[in-house]
A protein has these predicted regions:
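A generic "binding-loop/recognition-motif" signal
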Residues: 25, 57, 124
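Flexible, acidic/His-enriched mid-domain "rim/lid" segments that flank
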Residues: 78-183
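Terminal domain-start leader segments
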Residues: 1-50, 80-81, 88-91, 112, ...
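Acidic, glycine-rich loop-and-beta core segments that form the ion-binding/anion-interacting portion
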Residues: 182-191
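Structural motif
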Residues: 22-24, 53-55, 74, 97-102
C-alpha cells in the first residue's frame, strides 16, 4: 500500500511541484513503510518519488518502499543535500511541506538550505487521508478483528491478583501474535 501517485496527482491543485514528507504518519501513508520517529524523509514529485533514511533503515526501505528512489543519509550526505539533488533532477521550485507537523527549527533549517520556495501544504495530505481506498478499508477491518480476538482472549485471563500492567502487556502480545504490525497507542487498562 503506497500513495505516492495520489499525492502527485494533487500537486497541481495546490500549485506545487513537489511535497516534502517528514511526519512519520505521512511518510507511511505515502510509502507503506513504517520507520521510527524522525528517521526518514520522503519527497513526492510529478516526475518521481524519493525516500531518504539512515543506515539503520536503509535495507528495510529498499525491501518495502516501491515506486521511489531510495538513498541513504549520513554525515557526508545530509537530508538537505539529497533533497536538493532530487529536486534539481525533477525540476521542483515550489515545495509543499507539512506546516502542521514541522517544528520551527526544522522549517528554518529547510528554508535556509533547500533551493526552492517552501509552501505550507498539510491540507493536501489531510484531504487525501480522509477518504479510504478498498485496501485501507480491508486493513482497518483486519486490524479490528485482531483487536477483537485479543480482547476476547484477555477477558478469559482477567482474575484477582493479575495487575493492570500484566493485562496490558499480555493484550499487546496477543495483538502482535495475532498479526498486528504495531500498536497505534499503548493499551489502556484500568480497574
Amino acid at each position: 500500500m503506497n500513495h505516492f501517485a495520489k499525492i502527485a496527482e494533487k500537486l497541481n491543485t495546490y500549485g506545487l511541484d513537489g511535497m516534502l514528507l517528514t511526519c512519520e504518519a505521512n511518510r507511511f501513508y505515502a510509502s507503506g513503510f513504517h520507520s521510527t520517529g524522525t528517521d526518514g524523509v520522503a519527497l513526492v514529485t510529478r516526475e518521481g518519488n524519493f525516500y531518504f533514511t539512515d543506515s539503520r533503515y536503509i535495507e528495510a526501505a529498499h525491501n518495502k518502499v516501491q515506486n521511489a528512489e531510495i538513498a541513504q543519509t549520513d554525515a557526508a550526505h545530509p537530508y538537505v543535500d539529497l533533497i536538493n539533488a532530487a529536486m534539481e533532477k525533477t525540476h521542483v521550485q515550489k515545495l509543499g511541506f507539512e506546516d502542521a507537523y514541522m517544528t520551527v527549527a526544522d522549517y528554518r533549517h529547510y528554508s535556509e538550505k533547500l533551493h526552492c520556495e517552501l509552501v505550507p501544504a498539510t491540507e493536501l495530505l489531510i484531504s487525501l487521508r480522509q477518504s479510504k481506498d478498498a485496501e485501507e478499508v480491508e486493513r482497518m477491518i483486519a486490524a479490528q478483528r485482531i483487536a477483537e480476538g485479543a480482547l476476547d482472549q484477555i477477558l478469559k485471563e482477567i482474575k484477582p491478583g493479575v495487575t493492570e500492567k500484566e493485562i496490558a502487556a499480555r493484550l499487546q502480545y496477543l495483538m502482535l501474535a495475532g498479526g498486528a504490525e504495531n500498536m497505534s497507542f499503548d493499551p489502556i487498562v484500568a480497574s
